[in-house]
Amino acid sequence: MSNLISLTRDLIGDPSGAEQTFTDDQIERSLDVYRWDFRYFPLKPLPTVVSRNVEYRDWYSDELYWESDAALYDGSYGSLTPSSSDPIHGRWSFAAHQTAVLVSGKIYDPYGAAVDLLEMWAGKVALEYDVNADGAGLSRSQKRAALLELAAQYRKQQKIITAKQERADVW
């Protein structure tokens, strides 16, 4: 989860430290709103040619942003241990050929979480005020506008959710 929290912090421009706006727990709660659980989800192979034979050592998912605790299984549901993994990009590699790889774990939408956090942050800074004194001006309202503008940009990048609707009044 720490990689996803760091990624979300990077997206919203809130580095961890003494001056951070959000705690890791607040970011994790926002990520949990945009979480999907997968059980035995089939991965796709990337072929590798070894001595003129095709082997499947590298596997990937079309879904991105997996939590690092994702578990991998072979076609008979035996546990697998990858030689390398990149769960943020949904990629796992093995030292030996695998015929099928399934993954169980959670994916997140850091862009959706970033939008929520940016909108909360904009709500916080909306309470700040602009000051004009002796011809000099300090404008804090531009911070709110910038946060909302970034939120609107990320809203376009977040995961699309669709639902099937059935009408009971139409036969």
List each model region and its residues.
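Amphipathic protein-protein interaction modules
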Residues: Y108-A145
